[in-house]
Amino acid sequence: MSNAHHDAFDKATKAGFIIALGIVYGDIGTSPLYTMQSLVDNQGGLSQVSEAFILGSVSLIIWTLTLITTIKYVLIALKADNHHEGGIFSLFTLVRRMSRWLIIPAMLGGATLLSDGALTPAVTVTSAIEGLKAVPELSSIYQNQTNVILTTLLILMVLFGLQRFGTGVIGKLFGPVMLVWFSVLGISGLLNSLQHLEILKAINPYYALHLLVSPENHRGIFILGSIFLATTGAEALYSDLGHVGRGNIYASWPFVKVCIILSYCGQAAWILAHKDSGIALNPFFASVPEGLRVYLVILATLAAIIASQALISGSFTLVSEAMRLKIFPLFKITYPGANLGQLYIPVINWSLFAVTSCTVLYFRTSAHMEAAYGLAITITMLMTTILLAYYLIKEGVKPLLASLLMAFFAFIEFIFFLASAVKFMHGGYVVVVLALAIVFVMVIWHAGTVIVAKYVKSLSLNDYKHQIKLLRDDLRFDLYQTNVVYLTNRMKKDLIDRSILYSILDKRPKRAQVYWFVNVRVTDEPYTATYKVDMLGTDYIVCVELYLGFRMPQTVPRYLRTIVQDLMESGRLPKQVQDYTITPGREVGDFRFVIIEERVSHARQLSTLERFVMQTKASIKHVTASPMRWFGLQYSEATVEVVPLLLSDVLKLPIKEIKACTKDEKA
């Protein structure tokens, strides 16, 4: 990576500052919508709130944002960039060679982050729409929760429906809208805080620690389940590192943090002033003058949509990275914009919409959603902490120091996990079940890949290239294709899967001028596109190692065109002049791509567990994208050949021949 590119990544600009506000902080920036309301509701309402409770709650929020978001994520995790990309899978690619078991926290963290993404749009949009209850002109309509639900579902349907068109145009508005949002949070919070300056005492961590053991706190340590809502967007902050650059996050986070803290302080000041009034409104909206509430609801709805959009886009990126790391099934990906980073996965989009809509219908109110929210993300944060410990050791930090530092954060996050665990019985099981389902799919997919690698045998192309040459020149066989391209997941030097040679020589001899063997390797760098070629001293066998970054589309035909051109220009591959063509001077013949698909038959060598894994993976494949689409072959001539996983394993069933009786035997 060039120094100029590295400097740009660490540099802050005015435009980058605005863009960061729109992309990075949607989740954490909308937390003030529901965090204080959750604290008050779980305490038993305004009448049960005391000054010590409010001071302690705000202090807990301030120090959670400081320790988890600022120190762990902004100051430490942002340093762990994989060629300027962030997120749990990027972090995993940096440390995966240090220990094989690290794939476990990567899978758990990715699954819980993805399941959390299904709940975030539901809780943020519902909280914003419920703000209409505080608008006198509309309160009569929206006191009926059914109207809140219908409005929320309509917004979500439009939001998910627009994903296929990309966010290139509307995305430019995200930054300015969020700038206005954070400014309003800060200004309104400051104005309310000036009415009760004693709220500023919450900066002292004493009030946070005191509240945890105070009898005025009715929930004890479980209050942290509500406090954690204030920092749920910290993981998304790290995941979006590649979109905006480290410098812009460093520059924008202080502004965002101050505005968020002022908002919490302002809501707390309003609560102190009205704790005996019996008002049953969300402190976020109630702390603003009645005449301005409708505008705040509109702004809050826009902010909630932006936060939801960030989570949806983040889910697409997360799934695409998992697919390229071969720990998730392949699904169709499209790129609605000119930017490779702007992608769309239809199956994931509509699955998220279904889960989000069901969440709204099942929980009905934001209060019930908040009771279930946050449990999954505590697990994600714990998994990130484990991977960060290995990263620090890899970067030269003494193992003891790295372990102690990460143990400190792990302890805090584990306490949050325990405090949030009570949410399991209040709806948290929905997210947990969803996360476990995703983990199950990941484990099956990865284990299936390991099993195939264990049993599939390889043969040397050098041992068979003479046979291939004889086949190429054997005119008794019709020309199958000028170029036959075999896509393989496993190729090392001249070693390829036996099933490929079986397809060429045994199944039905395939005569061609050139035999291509292409292996796509996913690199740790996100945007790599390089290749290596070994022709084994021939002009009719081409072994291609195609190195693509984990964020690059694996459209093989597009890359192969360039490789063919390079080989012909360098004289390593004979030109294939075409006598009949509509393209004058065409020197490249036709291509046929062949994909070998291993299937489990009655494989006696497989254990019961291995057979279950392979059969389950085969079942999952029925609802995933075909290799044709994944490798961009839908517009090319391509064939999928099915072969048994173990070619030599032929199940012999007992059977006896019935011999015809002779005349003597009949007599």
UniProtKB/Swiss-Prot annotation:
Localization: Cell membrane
UniProt KW Transmembrane helix keyword: yes
Gene Ontology CC, one term: plasma membrane
Membrane topology: Multi-pass membrane protein
InterPro entries: K+_transporter, K_trans_C, K_trans_N, Kup
A Pfam family recorded for this sequence: K_trans
Catalytic activity: K(+)(in) + H(+)(in) = K(+)(out) + H(+)(out)
Transmembrane is among the record's keywords: yes
Keywords: Cell membrane, Ion transport, Membrane, Potassium, Potassium transport, Symport, Transmembrane, Transmembrane helix, Transport
Transmembrane regions: 16-36, 58-78, 101-121, 146-166, 167-187, 221-241, 253-273, 294-314, 343-363, 373-393, 399-419, 431-451
Tree of life domain: Bacteria
PANTHER family registered for this protein in UniProt: K+ POTASSIUM TRANSPORTER, OSMOTIC STRESS POTASSIUM TRANSPORTER
Function, in words: Transport of potassium into the cell. Likely operates as a K(+):H(+) symporter.
Protein name: Probable potassium transport system protein Kup
Species this chain originates from: Streptococcus equi subsp. zooepidemicus (strain MGCS10565)
